[in-house]
């Protein structure tokens, strides 16, 4: 028996374990279906299957794995349990974020003498996947002001800070532990995200809703929506407040940026002494590769307009101001004049002038800088536009390649510092121009009626310099001694290639005379007289005189500047002109009468009668509609006696009703013979009055006999 049992046990022992398990499961299934063939083996098998196929959410291995991935779920659970028991504290848990805050409106209970006071001052974020934290913060934060998309340094306006309290002690430490950060009473308006987030690990950080308290010496730079005052900072900063050396950011917040700073009447030495290309690093960091190597102009963020300075009735100005305030991608391009032999102070002046001095020629600064003129026409800003215009004229006007032009430039730079010879002419012409507007500017901008409305309309932007506008500073009479030095400098500036932007306004020839009368109070005649002198002096070298651009403000431009007009080589685009010829309107809408159409048809038929007589006789039965060579002619009854050569008006010979025959009812040859017989009678028609009724019942649609249609 033992020998017989060995071979039986041999193959059983040779079966692998996995196969044996499969066989046992099959037996268990068969026993369950067959009514218990092997109850002893089926019971433990059923128990094992029930344990292994439980719900996955309650599986201890899955729970452990989820807690391990969550990164210290036990510590987070302990924190959640602890703060849920505190009255007046609300704890929220979303994935891997635990938010603890005070319930708004809960009456604060008097704290125990030895108990620590808990405030909603931190949000612990641990092990957060990228991209989820910002959405959760936006979800649980109070509604904030709209922000720019795509800027990583956008500022988060803090919620109203609760009353000051001692910082809470660190509770049971989560993993990784949040480093306690110093907290102040409130974040400054220009705080960055780093003021609210404190990184504690590779993917963990602590959020401080009230912001971190930064040092008093630290200068805050913001790149997003912070406040309306810092938005107008770089364009409205005084020339006497120099910024730091390394603070050329797109958004520089001055300490107290006033919206209406008086222009500095000082000399160009009051400009901050910074290197000439100090404005270019921010440009190279913030614009696309198409303009990054470009030192010809400087790109700055456009200042926000101030709605209080715009009158309520000016709908166009307010609409434009709201467009500028809400545009997400607005910037300002300031061309820089390239002076190769100029000393460094003048190069700095060319970079710093548009923001240092507030002149009326910059449309981007009007809404924020020009005050509404009061009762007296000339406020305290009366002499500053003259200085600014003299400086701008020198900045673009001087020929940088000749020594005489440099000497002329130095002479012009000294003129604004000594304003007494210009003050009589300035006071006379600044009063009708409302203090901020000068007659030189009134010629090119008739829309300078309100100080809050920008007036620059750019039709074309060329990359060549317009030296004729640059040589004339915007001074009425005292600028005339500068004329003799102009032609020699213009001959030097004939080759193209300088990077001064030129505005080419499209104007009709008659608008210059219209501006004489419409702006008599602003006295633009000295400027135009100078233009005539300049055109006579320059001769055929220059076609027209155009004002050069100091600033170009782009409102809501492209995200990539490589698509904008600033980087295109040529500005000539295909223009479609839609015009209406007023002289041809009458002939366009004048339709010929039916009698004239009939006469034209008769002449054509007489010419073609010999050629087509045979073919038309064959087709006379079914060719009623094909007999008409003129498309507009309708087969109606014809008054042969009323057809006149000059009968474009009422046909007077409408008495021959008995002689009319419908054209389609007669053969063509007979009808033509009848028409030829009636032709001699057309010369002397009988003077019979016209009938005011339709010709016949069959001809109700033919109203040739009604004179009302022909007068």
Swiss-Prot record:
It is found in: Cell projection, Stereocilium; Cell projection, Microvillus; Nucleus, Nucleoplasm; Cytoplasm. Residues 134-305, 328-384, 414-438, 500-535, 572-630, 642-662, 674-711 are annotated as: Disordered. GO terms for cellular component: cytoplasm; microvillus; nucleoplasm; stereocilium; stereocilium base. InterPro entries: Phostensin/Taperin_N_dom, Phostensin/Taperin_PP1-bd_dom, PPP1R18/Tprn. It comes from the Eukaryota. Residues 597-624 have a biased composition (Acidic residues). Residues 197-206, 283-296, 512-521, 581-590 have a biased composition (Polar residues). Expression is detected in fetal cochlea. Residues 157-180 have a biased composition (Pro residues). GO terms for biological process: auditory receptor cell stereocilium organization; sensory perception of sound; stereocilium maintenance. Keywords: Actin-binding, Cell projection, Cytoplasm, Deafness, Hearing, Non-syndromic deafness, Nucleus, Phosphoprotein, Protein phosphatase inhibitor. It is linked to Deafness, autosomal recessive, 79: A form of non-syndromic deafness characterized by progressive and severe sensorineural hearing loss. There are no symptoms of vestibular dysfunction. Essential for hearing. Required for maintenance of stereocilia on both inner and outer hair cells. Necessary for the integrity of the stereociliary rootlet. May act as an actin cytoskeleton regulator involved in the regulation of actin dynamics at the pointed end in hair cells. Forms rings at the base of stereocilia and binds actin filaments in the stereocilia which may stabilize the stereocilia. Acts as a strong inhibitor of PPP1CA phosphatase activity. Recruited to sites of DNA damage and may play a role in DNA damage repair. Belongs to the taperin family. PANTHER family: TAPERIN (PTHR21685:SF1), TON-B BOX DOMAIN (PTHR21685). This is Taperin. The gene is TPRN.
């Amino acid at each position: 028996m033992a020998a017989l049992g060995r071979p039986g046990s041999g193959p059983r022992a040779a079966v692998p374990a996995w196969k044996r398990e499969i066989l046992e499961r099959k037996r268990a299934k068969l026993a369950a279906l067959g009514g218990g063939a092997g109850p002893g083996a089926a019971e433990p098998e059923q128990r094992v299957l029930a344990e292994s196929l439980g719900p996955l959410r309650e599986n201890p291995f899955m729970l452990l794995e989820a807690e391990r991935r969550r990164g210290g779920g036990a510590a987070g659970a302990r924190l959640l349990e602890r703060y849920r028991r505190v009255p007046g504290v609300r704890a929220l848990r979303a994935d891997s974020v635990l938010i603890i805050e005070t319930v708004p409106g809960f009456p604060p209970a008097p704290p125990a003498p030895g108990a620590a006071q808990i405030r909603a001052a931190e949000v612990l974020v641990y092990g957060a996947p990228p991209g989820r934290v910002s959405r959760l913060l936006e979800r649980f934060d109070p509604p904030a002001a709209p922000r720019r998309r795509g800027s990583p340094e956008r500022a988060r306006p803090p919620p109203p800070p609760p009353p000051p309290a001692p910082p809470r002690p660190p509770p049971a430490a989560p993993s990784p532990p949040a480093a306690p950060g110093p907290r102040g009473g409130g974040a400054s308006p220009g705080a960055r995200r780093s003021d609210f987030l404190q990184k504690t690990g590779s993917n963990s950080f602590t959020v401080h809703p009230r912001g971190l308290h930064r040092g008093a010496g630290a200068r805050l730079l913001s790149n997003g929506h912070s406040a309306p005052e810092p938005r107008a900072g770089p364009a409205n900063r005084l020339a006497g407040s120099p910024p730091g050396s390394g603070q050329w950011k797109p958004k520089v917040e001055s300490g107290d940026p006033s919206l209406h700073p008086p222009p500095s009447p000082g000399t160009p030495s009051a400009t901050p002494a910074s290197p000439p290309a100090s404005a270019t690093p921010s440009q190279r960091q913030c614009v696309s590769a198409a303009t990054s190597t470009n030192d010809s102009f400087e790109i700055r963020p456009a200042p926000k307009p101030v709605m209080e300075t715009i009158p309520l009735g000016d709908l166009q100005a307010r609409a434009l101001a709201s467009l500028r305030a809400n545009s997400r991608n607005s910037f300002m391009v300031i061309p820089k004049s390239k002076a190769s032999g100029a000393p460094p102070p003048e190069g700095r002046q060319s970079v710093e002038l548009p923001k240092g001095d507030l002149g009326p020629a910059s449309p981007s600064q009007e809404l924020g800088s020009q005050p509404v003129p009061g009762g007296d026409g000339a406020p305290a800003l009366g002499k500053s536009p003259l200085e600014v215009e003299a400086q701008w004229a020198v900045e673009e006007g001087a020929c940088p390649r000749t020594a005489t032009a440099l000497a002329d430039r130095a002479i012009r730079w000294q003129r604004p510092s000594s304003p007494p010879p210009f003050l009589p002419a300035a006071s006379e012409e600044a009063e009708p121009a409302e203090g901020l507007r000068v007659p030189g500017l009134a010629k090119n901008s008739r829309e300078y009626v309100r100080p809050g409305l920008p007036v620059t309309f750019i039709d074309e932007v060329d990359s060549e310099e317009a030296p004729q506008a640059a040589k004339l500073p915007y001074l009425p009479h005292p600028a005339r001694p500068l004329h003799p030095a102009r032609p020699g400098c213009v001959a030097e500036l004939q080759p193209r290639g300088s990077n001064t932007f030129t505005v080419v306004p499209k104007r009709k020839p008659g608008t210059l005379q219209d501006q004489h009368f419409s702006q008599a109070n602003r006295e633009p005649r000295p400027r135009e007289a100078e233009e005539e002198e300049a055109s006579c002096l320059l001769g055929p070298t220059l076609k027209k005189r155009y004002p050069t651009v100091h600033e170009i403000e782009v409102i809501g431009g492209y995200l990539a500047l490589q698509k904008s007009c600033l980087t295109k080589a040529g500005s000539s685009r295909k223009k479609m002109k839609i015009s209406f010829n007023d002289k041809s309107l009458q002939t366009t809408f004048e339709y010929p009468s039916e009698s004239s159409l009939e006469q034209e048809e008769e002449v054509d038929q007489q010419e073609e009668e010999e050629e087509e007589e045979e073919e038309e006789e064959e087709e006379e039965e079914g060719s009623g509609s094909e007999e008409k060579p003129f498309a507009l002619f309708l087969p109606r009854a014809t008054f042969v006696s009323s057809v006149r050569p000059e009968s474009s008006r009422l046909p007077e010979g409408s008495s021959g009703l008995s002689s009319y025959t419908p054209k389609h009812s007669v053969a063509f040859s007979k009808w033509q013979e009848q028409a030829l017989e009636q032709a001699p009678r057309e010369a002397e028609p009988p003077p019979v009055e016209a009938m005011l009724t339709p010709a016949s019942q069959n001809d109700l649609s033919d109203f040739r006999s009604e004179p009302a249609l022909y007068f």
